[in-house]
Amino acid sequence: MAQEKPDGRPRPSGPWTDRVSFADGAGFAYVPGSVLTTDPEGLTAVARRLWEKDRVRTGRTLGPFTEIAGVRDPLVLAREARLAGIVAQPDHVFFAHCEPCCPPHPAASCGGGAGANPVYATPVYATPVYATPVYATDVHASPVYATPVYATTASPARASGVRRSSARPAPEGVDTTSATEAFGVVAEGPPRVIVLDTGFAGTDAPGALSTTTVRPASAADVDAPDEDGNGFLDPASGHGTFIAGLVQQVAPGTEVVVHRVLSTMGDGAESNIVQCLADLEVPDPQRTIVSLSFGGFALEQAFAMEWAVRRLQAMGVVVVASAGNDGSCRPTFPAAFPGVVSVGAVGPYGPAPFSNYGPWVRACAPGVDLLSTFFDGYDGKEPPGDRGVDTDKFDGWALWSGTSFSAPVVAGALARTIAAEKCTAADAVKRVVDEPALMRIPNLGTVVNVI
């Protein structure tokens, strides 16, 4: 239940309440008490001027940025520091893009600006778009969906209205044979896709991934189904495992390394993400893709994360990021950073209504009811629905929707191109995304055909 603000508007609440604050009227989230700056001494001086008795403390060093903790009001301090010419920003919190129409971004209800642009009142849905081949075919004929990644069998609706995970077990009748056969094919000198997400399933890993080149970066990068111990699947549990399976389906044999930067509730602090990006081991950067299926809005821009992304890009690494599920044209980060391959979602008949859009979105790929790997043998406390279907009993496969899953499809397409054509990641982007002859949807970019 959302809490009431003094003005009567609902205040976002949820599993992030103790570790996330929301900026009223601005639609972004941040870590309470934390500011990132390139001038820790200058920022400390501003903090002491504002709150004489407060003692802020220096935290981690993140490249040129330093984490300052113990701040009474991060938004006030960041604003005053910027007025003094100091680079400073809140430690933004970003969320997994895994819950379409839920709403997907908890900060969106903080103010009118975050989701104020109705998707159906934009050029994305203008008449000329509907004349394209994406809309001219049915789900079985569309080249975008002629792949085992997309499950065509309808699945039952969730019986409970309680917001938990939006992942659903693969229903009876969905053929996972072709998807399973895509795993375990090892290419010569495979490219690497690095996934920053909720981690990778440990002992609950699906059998389809047991003999492949998918692995967690360390023992600490483990995805878990129910970290809060309430008996229900957490909202973003399995997110990283699902994404890793998508990459392997599209690009068999690709080395997939999964890092944990998000909680199973779906939130992750910018400082933790920046530290992970800065510490990545990239032995062959020109054949490496980083896939990010999270994002959010920012005070102005997430400068610390942009530094980390630009650093990787300068090495030759390609960064792919999901555009978000807010149904808005407002840019989200990291997808909107320069040079990032930002990815929106399409369904079998055109743009997914939940997908973010705009000139900053470079590509789109299937993102509705995708079939991929999930926890094997997990059965939560969700009661069976009126059709007798257990909606949180998983056997290693699941259906999920969101731009979170469109991004790894594109990352996989790039990895497959690198392996097949012996090219760099940058050259793969030119062929898969930037080639002028490719089909495009206004405000959603190039349609990435995953056949």
Indicate residue ranges for each PLM-predicted region:
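Active-site core segment of subtilase-fold serine proteases
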Residues: 105-255, 275, 282-286, 372, ...
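C-terminal subdomain of the subtilisin-like protease fold in secreted/lumenal serine endopeptidases
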Residues: 286-294, 300-303, 308, 315-317, ...
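A cross-family glycoside hydrolase active-site/sugar-binding cleft signature
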Residues: 91, 260, 291-295, 322-323, ...
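Active-site environment of divalent metal-dependent phosphoester hydrolases
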Residues: 202, 325-330
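Mature extracellular/periplasmic domains of secretome proteins
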Residues: 183-188, 245-249, 267-291, 301-319, ...
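Extracellular S/T/G-rich loop segment that most often corresponds to the catalytic His/Ser-adjacent loop
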Residues: 197-199, 317, 332-419
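Autoinhibitory propeptides
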Residues: 2-36, 41-136, 141-166, 350
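Short helix-loop-beta-strand segments that form the rim/entrance of peptidase-like active sites
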Residues: 247-267, 272, 422-436
